[in-house]
């Protein structure tokens, strides 16, 4: 009986195919990939059949065959009515107008819904079959310029979807581009912070690269080297501690914390301070140490420097054009054992003093 019934419906199939070819001329682009001649022809035939013959005709369609094998569901007429009611009963699917009756839209949605994948009703609207036009969109996104080629590759292996996946792709591409723009400054700051600790050099090599051009003498910076380190010194507050032939770099050190660290390190010879003032102090201050700004003491003692051990030597060095302050504290015969350098961001008036050793010679 089923064969005779199908033989009697051949003229309607031919008529539906002719109407389908006429509708194909009106469609410019099928972005959702729902255009399928077999499903469209059967859906058109179902639309022309009376309601009594719809259940018998739907039993022979591939969509219901896959539905019965997947979950053993009933006929297509009741479920298609539910989908039509859920979608609003119109011919518009997410802003894209589809030419044809409602059964075309419902048939394509139901065939994808009962193909074996469990999806919700909201997700089934975006689910379509693999169509050459959707593959063309994925190829365009994959071969696009710049950042389009980074996050499209893992998503290209998934089944293509409609506008929901394209919006999801654009959202991920915008976030990845924002991350790429923020990678640059953080990498530069990290390399600047780890420049001394990553090299692992020992001896006066690290000391000369950070503090002075000549590694044999401890003296102030030359004016030629201030231009190269101006940007590095003004961008961050760094403290470099040389101990045991290794350099340890610390970023964003507060001046008060640097004073405490330098006071603890110089407990045998007095306290050291990294702060600069516009006017030199006229009286001795026990908290900041018995030093005057811009002066250098080598051995012996004076009225202004009581209780100064003769073997200790302190040399503050100032850059004439840079905003950073560097002080080097060593002991005779122990130039390579330990030293502390503090770099600040404060812009103060530099003080220029001559070296007593150079004046004596």
From Swiss-Prot:
PROSITE patterns: TIFY. Residues 53-78, 113-134, 190-232, 268-361 are annotated as: Disordered. Keywords: Jasmonic acid signaling pathway, Nucleus, Transcription, Transcription regulation, Ubl conjugation. Residues 333-361 have a biased composition (Basic and acidic residues). Residues 232-267 form the Tify domain. It comes from the Eukaryota. Residues 56-78 have a biased composition (Low complexity). Belongs to the TIFY/JAZ family. Repressor of jasmonate responses. This is Protein TIFY 8.
């Amino acid at each position: 009986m089923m064969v005779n019934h199908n033989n009697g419906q051949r003229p309607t199939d031919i008529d539906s195919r002719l109407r389908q070819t006429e509708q194909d001329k009106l469609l410019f682009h099928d972005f959702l990939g729902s255009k399928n001649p077999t499903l469209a022809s059967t859906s058109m035939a179902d639309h022309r059949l009376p309601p009594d013959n719809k259940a018998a005709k739907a039993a022979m369609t591939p969509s219901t065959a896959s539905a019965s094998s997947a979950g053993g569901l009933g006929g297509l007429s009741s479920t298609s009515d539910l989908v039509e009611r859920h979608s609003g009963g119109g011919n518009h699917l997410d802003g894209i107008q589809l030419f044809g009756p409602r059964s075309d839209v419902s048939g394509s949605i139901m065939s994808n819904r009962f193909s074996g994948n469990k999806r919700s009703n909201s997700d089934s609207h975006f689910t379509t079959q693999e169509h050459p036009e959707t593959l063309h969109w994925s190829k365009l996104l994959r071969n696009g310029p710049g950042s389009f080629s980074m996050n499209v590759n893992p998503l290209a292996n998934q089944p293509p979807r409609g506008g929901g996946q394209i919006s999801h792709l654009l959202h991920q591409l915008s976030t990845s581009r924002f991350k790429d723009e923020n990678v640059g400054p953080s990498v530069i700051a990290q390399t600047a912070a780890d420049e001394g600790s990553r090299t692992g050099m020992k001896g006066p090599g690290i000391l000369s690269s950070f503090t002075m051009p000549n590694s044999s003498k401890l003296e102030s910076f030359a004016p030629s080297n201030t231009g190269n380190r101006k940007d590095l010194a003004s961008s961050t507050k760094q403290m470099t501690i040389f101990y045991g032939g290794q350099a340890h770099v610390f970023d964003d050190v507060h001046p008060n914390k640097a004073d405490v660290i330098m006071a603890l390190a110089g407990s045998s010879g007095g306290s050291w301070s990294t702060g600069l003032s516009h006017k030199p102090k006229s009286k001795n201050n026990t908290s900041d140490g018995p030093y005057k700004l811009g002066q250098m003491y080598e051995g012996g003692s004076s009225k202004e420097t009581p209780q100064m051990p003769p073997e200790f030597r302190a040399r503050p060095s100032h850059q004439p054009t840079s905003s950073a302050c560097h002080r080097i504290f060593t002991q005779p015969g122990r130039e390579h054992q330990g030293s502390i350098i503090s770099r600040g961001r404060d812009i103060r008036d530099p003080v220029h003093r001559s070296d007593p050793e150079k004046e004596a010679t």
